Amino acid sequence: LMDLVGSTPAMQSLRESIRIAADDDRTVLVRGEPGSGTTLIAEGLHRCSRRAGKPFLRIDCSLHSVETLEHQLFGDATADGFPGYLKMGDGGSILLDNVDTVALPFQKRLAQLLEQRATSVLNGTMDGPNIRFIAATHCDLNRLAMEGRFRDDLLQHLSGITLQSPPLRVRTND
């Protein structure tokens, strides 16, 4: 967690929360204002976890169409096609950065994927992908869900553990 600079109580608390979350395999939602280090938090979480020696893959959801996101995550079924992050990241972590920008149809697909993963973890079967999902956002997903712009079921699946990055304005000494 050396990349997360700062000695304020807020940063010390965040580092401790990351260490605790690293031992838990649930999906993590990282929230914070732009520039507050949500990607660094996700990377630090991965490096502290038992998945540290496995891939850490990042998808910036704001940069891709639904079709590209689908291809990047699930891959191409053809023999010589792109395997997709779910296969490439086996045993590791996938960061869904700017998850608030995902279109509603793909949100449904993500919710189904996370439901499958959660069920297999609870049953101890690991039938679904052996991936830890981390989502990051600068938006209030609860508000977006109330406005009908973000699926409630996806929000529930993403909020297994929530980490809040302290705003830069409250850690001016850092």
Model-derived segments and spans:
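Charged helix-capping and loop-helix junction motifs
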Residues: M146-F150
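AAA+ ATPase active-site-proximal loops
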Residues: L1-A145, L158, T162, P166-T172
